[in-house]
Amino acid sequence: MSATGPAVCHPVGMTEYPYTDGGDFVPYEGRRFTVPEMRSRAEEYLELMSQRRSIRTFADDPVPRELVETAIRTAGTAPSGAHQQPWTFVLVGDPAIKKQIRLAAEEEERTNYLHARMPDDWKEEITRLGTSWQKPYLESAPWLVVLFEQRYGVESDGSRRKHYYAKESVGIAAGIFIAALHNMGLATLTHTPSPMAFLSRLLDRPGNERPFVLFPIGFPREGSVVPRLKRKAIDEILIEFGG
């Protein structure tokens, strides 16, 4: 409400928001660049991210905890349904817990690979990338981060709060986390052992949280190799309707 009556919605401009009734709003402080600056920043970022690869061999060099925390804080800037931020990042550096996670993951993956729980076509697709049921990087990486999806929120009185688009929101946060790590020179891998319920048990997570993805994090070991891969060209991933 304004001093003279109900608020009026005006056409959206650079500093206006279409519907502000009932909310708490502050001025947007984003920076606008010139077109040449935009092109330069975009190309530099594309070149940086084009070098990103999944790494399974990590150096023994320690990684300062604050670097991983900064990447988590960056991931926490992700958009989410109704701004409910339905994610929990669990940071693991304890060698004993990392070993427990590795053993539990390998037990599940051994069953997947060796006892027909994994479809043959999927096994063929990932085997050519050099994967197996053995996951030594879950111990050798200095840090593990397990990202949990909060399927619903829990209020202070124990009641449930519905979360909207939780899976999509957590997926976006995961992508930003990967980019943040790569930007600072750290490597990671998206690992999704199936099933993943053991992560909830080992990390003592509540029932409203579900494991989403596991990230081993560290510096690539010297001499690390990665599969020779080709990313899709722009005309394979872009459909345009003009503009």
Give the predicted meaning of each segment:
Residues 11, 15-18, 88-170:
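Glycine/small-residue-rich phosphate/adenosyl-binding loop
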Residues 76-83:
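Glycine-rich phosphate/pyrophosphate-binding beta-alpha loops
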Residues 74-76, 128-133, 199-201, 224:
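Glycine-rich, charged/polar anion/phosphate-binding loops
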Residues 52, 71-76, 145, 151-202:
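Small-aliphatic-rich amphipathic alpha-helix that forms the alpha element of a beta-alpha
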